[in-house]
Amino acid sequence: MPHASATNLGSGSITIAPYTWAKRKKREFDRIIGCYDPDTQRRKIIQFHLPDPPALLVLKFVDLDEPAPPPHDARKELRLASGDDLVSALEFDRPEERLLVHCHAGISRSSAIALAILAGRMGAGNERIAVGELFRIKPEAVPNLHVVTLADRLLARDGQLLEAVLACETPRSRERRRLNREAYLAYYGCN
């Protein structure tokens, strides 16, 4: 299974990858969006030590499809993505340039941000095509549903983007979502 995959839309491309791959290949891109946990230390964020680095957008939000249970939902380290995060990602995109979107595993947060960008590029009415393109780029993608919901609202897609993602759900993706939530909540002591 490849660690990263790309698609061309216009003269640029979108690649979705895990952090370790992104760290090695970062100079091959014009723009990078990194999705990190809110408590990620600066030294763990991709760094550039040579001149002329790619443009970098750092987004910090937890990989949960819905908020942690109260009272944990107010904790800074369990911050969900916001509309501002999505606006930043969409404004950061340049379709003519090579874009890398990464998160820790390259499966959920990065695929949801990439889907928002694909849907934005393709325009209203093409939500199923955008989701199809996402799964062509990254067959193992399990896009973060909270991020997809935000993108759907921000792009005024009337639920069509979220519906297109949910139509592709499998028992495996549902199980991955469940295990991911359990792991996050256990890690942050929310049991």
PLM regions: where:
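Anionic group-transfer/hydrolysis microenvironments
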Residues: Y36, V62, H104
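Short catalytic/ligand-binding loop motif for oxyanion handling, primarily in non-cytosolic enzymes
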Residues: Q41-R42, P67, S108-A112
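A structural signal for well-ordered alpha-helical segments within the folded catalytic domains
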Residues: D84-V87, S111-A112, L145, T149
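Intrinsically disordered, low-complexity regulatory segments
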Residues: A6, A55-D65, R177, A183-N191
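Helix-loop module immediately N-terminal to the HCX5R catalytic loop
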Residues: P53, L57-L100
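Catalytic cysteine-centered active loop of the rhodanese-like fold, especially the PTP/DSP P-loop
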Residues: F92-R121
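PTP/DSP superfamily signal
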Residues: R94-R98, A119-N191
